[in-house]
Amino acid sequence: MNNIIPTEETHPLTWRLRNDRETVWIEEYCKKNGYFSLKKALKTMCPEDVVHLIKESGLKGRGGAGFSTGLKWSLMSKDNSSKIRYLLCNADEMEPGTYKDRFLMENIPHQLIEGMLLSAFALNVSRGYIFLRGEYIKAEYILKKSIQEAINFGFIGSNILNSGFNFELFLHTGAGRYICGEETALINSLEGRRANPRAKPPFPAVFGLWGKPTCVNNVETLSNVPSIVLHGVNWYKKLSKSTDTTGTKLMGFSGKVNNPGVWELPFGTTAREILEDYARGMKSGLFLKSWQPGGAGTDFLIEKHLDLPMDFTSIAKAGSRLGTAIAMAVDNKTNMISLVCNIEKFFSRESCGLCTPCREGLPWIVKILESLEKKEGHKNDVKNLERLCLDLSPGKTFCAHAPGAVEPLQSAIKYFRLEFEAGISIKKLKKCSNILGIQSNEFTSKV
């Protein structure tokens, strides 16, 4: 990566980065072809053209779900009787270990703003919000300044570039809840309500913010739109090495690697390339024990999966999810029970409490893991954990919080079951075996 010079043709998201890593403000952004796509769209395209272009490009959501962006846009209500529609940028990046959206907002904020302008034009939207994670203080300052710059240059406001297109953009900082990454919880929070997910249908495209048609897209997703509009579908598709997904993606590795970071790479780049060529391998004296492909809420994979292409289908076939594609390396000296317990504490604390399986199941999982960590577990603890994974699986709760929370647990048991079984207390096992009278059925045959 260090020997590769990013260009507009190969690195559409990051080629404008400064060598000193300072923010690219509007004057420099305009000198680097900034807002060219907006001018092209407003002068030569209609909104339907932009929607069709994005659909043909194959752009998929970069927040983790990987849903087709063009298809999502086409689901927006076609009823033009209501002139109020909203575009929301999901910048509530609270996935542990993930920092790609912050990277884009702090370094190239106008790329996101231009992407929102193009998306708003395509969707006939005149008002947008950036819902920003509250802890991103630096990004908040940069985005506020950048929005004002765009207003001063006439890119935000009324009759933009004499096209008749109007757009207002507001920045909203969240109060710090993981669940706000779920789009309907985000909408509730923006309305001033408790951030609980909503029942679907109706979907936000029909009944969203304040009951109006609303589209919610991720920061990185929106940041891809300007280059697609400027350079076209065929160029964008050829960027990828994958047959599954088009374009490039911000990918990275964290953990005890020599060079943790994030890089823009073509879809289809293998995890091994990212770990060894970009993150420069594990630190001295350590080797890779396991890894999560895209955030704390994705299943663990092991060393044999490193040669898989990083795209949505290949990682799913291996039993995990691409997620945010910011991977975490787990070294051989890390206790899997302690690691998973830490992850589950986070998800338990961040549960909104609306669904019983999630509200009660996650704290129960934490208690069992704490017991196993102290070597004080009961004989059936591992089986109970597996049963809880099923009870919190997709379809059992209102949103994807609980299913995501149990993904690291179920995969850790799958690959490192002996570590979990080693947490069962031998003393308790013997004590139970010696009880005469009332005792659990599991020990009856041994008495």
Curated annotation (Swiss-Prot):
Keywords: 4Fe-4S, Flavoprotein, FMN, Iron, Iron-sulfur, Metal-binding, NAD, Quinone, Translocase. NAD(+) binds at residues 61-70. Its EC number is 7.1.1.-. It is an enzyme of class 7 (translocase). It comes from the Bacteria. Composed of 13 different subunits. Subunits NuoCD, E, F, and G constitute the peripheral sector of the complex. Belongs to the complex I 51 kDa subunit family. This is NADH-quinone oxidoreductase subunit F. It comes from Buchnera aphidicola subsp. Schizaphis graminum (strain Sg).
